[in-house]
């Protein structure tokens, strides 16, 4: 702590001081609230709603509303909010992040701002990390809200559309970040406005906010359809990768987590693939497949990054150690791993809609969050989300002892020491929770403990069904629990009888994570609500963090001391070296996320424009003016771009205009070149536009006026959706190749912004051309029907990419229209003979 902080207190101390007077006012209402009858207390909600409608603000109502929730909670749940919990609730209502230590009752804290903000009738979303917690919190806290006359809903994976609409219509809706994000994307793919499920995004409380807004910030949510590419080439590239020798044919850069061919490797590739120049842009696909095959074979580790289960490759979440069933790595990496493991290689998919969590959560009118560990990422929360972090004081002083790290030379020496520590601790009945970084390490430790005859439970991706159950017993006397990373987060570990007498829960970390926050989360499992507890990390110089990012100074010191495998050192220098290594990685990851958001912002602005236009099409009763505007733009642009201004070329220019418009909206023969050649440019535009309008009026007579309006909607929706999907793919390709611009002294992000903008404008022009073309060619054979461009069939989600510590896309899969299906434009023809011909 610096001198200024000692004198003035930290930022959080000062913010908490400002909130204390409000807490005192809420406290002062305690007696009068207790005196209210059941009916009087319940009637308060209707009173608050009326006062809000009459012009009072939520801040005006805060003191009374919080006091009402506190009293109702005491009566219904038997839990009365502590002063510290009220401070946390006020911070959340203000649209900030409450950092509250584990066991301080975050679930109860959220009831205060949720109730207050639900008074507006605009809905409150409470976001949790998994379906189990969403259901648990909704059922538990729902009793309180229902008592006070508010409705609650929960969004879980297997709900149908009607159930989702009901859940979102509730005053307070619980659910996971994935479900909220997917519903937003799906709402922007509907073909009838009645199919939408979400209301406008009003107020959101994100539980475990660091996990969702930092760890998963770069995870794109993707809804995808099946691609057409063959999967055979993955096997060809896999055979090539398996022939290579490390260091000679390729090198591995562990800091960026990438594998690169050497000159010798490039020569081998040219021979193997029968090509002259591996680096030639024509061979981009070969480079891509080879790069993914190298990644799959030499960077992705089985039982750490993924598991093979029932002949399928299943991703393991690096943050929680859970299996991510049905999720897939994008960009062909999943197929490359399938080829490596010899299981069926599935087809790549085509992206239909996508958004990152960063951009989804920034759309809420007010965003807030709570977690036990946010302060280390305070700068990122402030810069990217405009959220500040306020550390809430604990209800009772923390009694946990955090011992300094112990460092061993080798990993084996470290694990031997961990086992000895567990055996000794277990003798006196003190419960132990051991944190590991992977399934592989959990199982290694488990086998070592079995040899010593120590009874224990293993909690990792293989058994996550019993996760909450196992973790809730971890504080009982004599229990030894091994847990991967942050598995079981959100479930309290309560101490069993007699455990306080033997020192409380003991936490042993078997490796430092690259993020200090995740280490702090593991520590925070012990010593909840002033309980006794103890934590210590065991580290070896062979651990990934120390090997890749550790300082040479530390390694040299260990060499000089001549440490044996089983010898250990414990010093402040070691702890600070570890912390510096972690800061290095955190800083690096923050920079990557900042750069990526610059890229993503380009796509985000474009997405907003397209979704806004789509929404107007769904909502609008009459698109006729918009369609006529498109016809006008199209004709005016055609004239401007074709007429050169050279008199001798005028007739051939007009000929070219008529040829161009013939396929779109003006059949040849409707006007002669000679007639137009006598006119000025403006007169030509007006003449062609009036002719096109006449044809369109006649087209309207073939249908009824209502049918024509519906037809306009059907075709415009279809064209916008198809062009937008293609544009998403094009932007993804642009992003993948843009990094090379740095070699041309170009700023890649600027180049991406400019070229992405040009591509978007081109797409908008193409939407106009295609829409007008379809409308002028459609036949009056049957009433127009809206159909989806794709149908949703399964869910796909991907975890962390081997390439650069980034999280990979959450995917949901959808099916394309078959060539022989009826065309969705309503013509009555087969898709291949109608719109499919031009697709």
Swiss-Prot record:
GO molecular function terms listed in the Swiss-Prot or TrEMBL record: ATP binding; metal ion binding; protein-exporting ATPase activity
Record PROSITE patterns: SECA, SECA_MOTOR_DEAD
Role summary: Part of the Sec protein translocase complex. Interacts with the SecYEG preprotein conducting channel. Has a central role in coupling the hydrolysis of ATP to the transfer of proteins into and across the cell membrane, serving as an ATP-driven molecular motor driving the stepwise translocation of polypeptide chains across the membrane.
Keyword terms: ATP-binding, Cell membrane, Cytoplasm, Membrane, Metal-binding, Nucleotide-binding, Protein transport, Translocase, Translocation, Transport, Zinc
Single biological process term from Gene Ontology: protein import
Name the record gives this protein: Protein translocase subunit SecA
Subunit structure: Monomer and homodimer. Part of the essential Sec protein translocation apparatus which comprises SecA, SecYEG and auxiliary proteins SecDF. Other proteins may also be involved.
Membrane topology, from the record: Peripheral membrane protein
Cofactor comment text: May bind 1 zinc ion per subunit.
Residue sites binding ATP per the record: 85, 103-107, 492
One term under GO cellular component: cell envelope Sec protein transport complex
InterPro entries named among the record's database cross-references: Helicase_ATP-bd, Helicase_C-like, P-loop_NTPase, SEC_C_motif, SecA, SecA_CS, SecA_DEAD, SecA_motor_DEAD
Enzyme class label: translocase
């Amino acid at each position: 702590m610096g001198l200024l902080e000692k004198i003035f207190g930290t930022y959080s101390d000062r913010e908490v001081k400002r909130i204390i007077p409000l807490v005192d006012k809420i406290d002062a209402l305690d007696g009068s609230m207790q005196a209210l009858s059941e009916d009087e207390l319940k009637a308060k909600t209707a009173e608050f709603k009326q006062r809000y409608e009459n012009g009072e603000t939520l801040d005006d109502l805060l003191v009374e509303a919080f006091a009402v929730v506190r009293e109702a909670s005491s009566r219904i749940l038997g839990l009365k909010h502590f002063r510290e919990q009220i401070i946390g609730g006020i911070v959340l209502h203000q649209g900030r992040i409450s950092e509250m230590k584990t066991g301080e009752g975050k679930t109860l804290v959220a009831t205060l701002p949720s109730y207050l903000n639900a008074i507006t009738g605009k809905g409150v979303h409470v976001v949790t990390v998994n379906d189990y917690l969403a259901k648990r919190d909704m059922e538990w806290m729902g009793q309180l809200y229902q008592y006070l006359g508010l409705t609650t809903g929960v969004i879980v994976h297997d709900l149908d559309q009607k159930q989702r609409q009901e859940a979102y219509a509730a005053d307070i809706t619980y659910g996971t970040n994935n479900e909220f994000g997917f519903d937003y994307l799906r709402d922007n793919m509907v073909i009838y406005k009645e199919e939408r499920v979400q209301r406008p995004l009003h107020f959101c409380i994100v539980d475990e906010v660091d996990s969702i807004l930092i760890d998963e910030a770069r995870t794109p949510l993707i809804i995808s359809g099946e691609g057409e590419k063959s999967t055979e080439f993955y096997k060809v590239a896999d055979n090539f990768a398996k022939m290579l020798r490390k260091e000679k044919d390729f090198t591995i850069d562990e800091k960026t987590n990438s594998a690169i061919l050497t000159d010798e490797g490039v020569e081998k590739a040219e021979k193997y693939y029968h090509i002259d120049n591996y680096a030639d842009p024509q061979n981009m696909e070969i480079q891509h497949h080879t790069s993914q095959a190298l990644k799959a074979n030499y960077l992705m580790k089985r039982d750490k990054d993924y598991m093979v289960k029932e002949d399928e490759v299943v991703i393991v979440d690096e943050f929680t150690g859970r299996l991510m069933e049905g999720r897939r790595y994008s960009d062909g990496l999943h197929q490359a791993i399938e080829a490596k493991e010899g299981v069926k290689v599935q087809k790549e998919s085509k992206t239909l809609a996508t958004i990152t969590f960063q951009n989804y959560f920034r759309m809420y009118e007010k965003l807030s969050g709570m977690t036990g560990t946010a302060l280390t990422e305070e700068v990122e929360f402030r810069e990217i989300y405009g959220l500040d972090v306020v550390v809430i004081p604990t209800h009772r002083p923390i009694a946990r002892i955090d011992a300094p790290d112990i460092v061993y030379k080798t990993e084996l020496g470290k694990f031997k020491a961990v086992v000895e520590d567990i055996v000794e601790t277990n003798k006196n009945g003190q419960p132990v929770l051991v944190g590991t970084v992977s399934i592989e390490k959990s199982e290694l430790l488990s086998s070592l403990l079995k040899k010593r005859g120590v009874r224990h439970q293993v909690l990792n991706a293989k058994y996550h069904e019993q996760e909450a159950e196992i973790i809730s017993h971890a504080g009982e006397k004599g229990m030894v629990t091994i847990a991967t990373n942050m598995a079981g987060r959100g479930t309290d570990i309560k101490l069993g009888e007699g455990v306080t007498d033997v020192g409380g829960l003991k936490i042993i970390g078997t490796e430092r994570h690259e993020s200090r926050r995740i280490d702090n989360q593991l520590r925070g499992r012990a010593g909840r609500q002033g309980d006794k507890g103890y934590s210590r990390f065991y580290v070896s110089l062979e651990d990934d963090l120390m090997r890749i990012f550790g300082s040479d100074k530390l390694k040299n010191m260990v060499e000089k001391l001549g440490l044996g495998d089983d010898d250990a050192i414990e010093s402040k220098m070691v702890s600070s070296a570890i912390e510096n290594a972690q800061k290095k990685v955190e800083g690096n990851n923050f920079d990557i996320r900042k750069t990526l958001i610059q890229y993503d912002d380009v796509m985000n602005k474009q997405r907003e424009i397209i979704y806004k236009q789509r929404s107007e099409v769904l909502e609008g009763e009459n698109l006729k003016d918009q369609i006529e505007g498109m016809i006008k733009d199209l004709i005016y642009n055609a004239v401007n771009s074709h007429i050169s201004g050279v008199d001798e070329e005028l007739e051939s220019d007009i000929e070219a205009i008529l040829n161009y418009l013939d396929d779109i909206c003006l059949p040849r023969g409707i006007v002669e070149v000679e007639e137009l050649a006598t006119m000025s440019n403006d007169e030509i535009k007006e003449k062609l536009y009036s002719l096109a309008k006449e044809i369109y009026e006649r087209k309207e007579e073939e249908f009824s006026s209502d049918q024509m309006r519906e037809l306009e909607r059907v075709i415009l929706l279809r064209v916008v959706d198809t062009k937008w999907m293609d544009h998403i793919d094009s932007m993804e390709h642009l992003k993948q190749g843009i990094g090379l611009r740095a070699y041309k002294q170009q700023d890649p992000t600027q180049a991406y912004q400019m070229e992405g903008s040009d591509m978007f404008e081109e797409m908008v022009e193409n939407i106009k051309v295609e829409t007008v073309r379809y409308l002028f060619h459609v036949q009056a054979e049957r009433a127009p029907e809206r159909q989806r461009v794709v149908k949703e069939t399964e869910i796909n989600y991907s975890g962390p990419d081997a390439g650069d510590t980034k999280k990979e896309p959450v995917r949901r899969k959808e099916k394309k229209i078959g060539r022989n299906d009826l065309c969705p434009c309503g013509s009555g023809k087969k898709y291949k003979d109608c719109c499919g011909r031009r697709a």
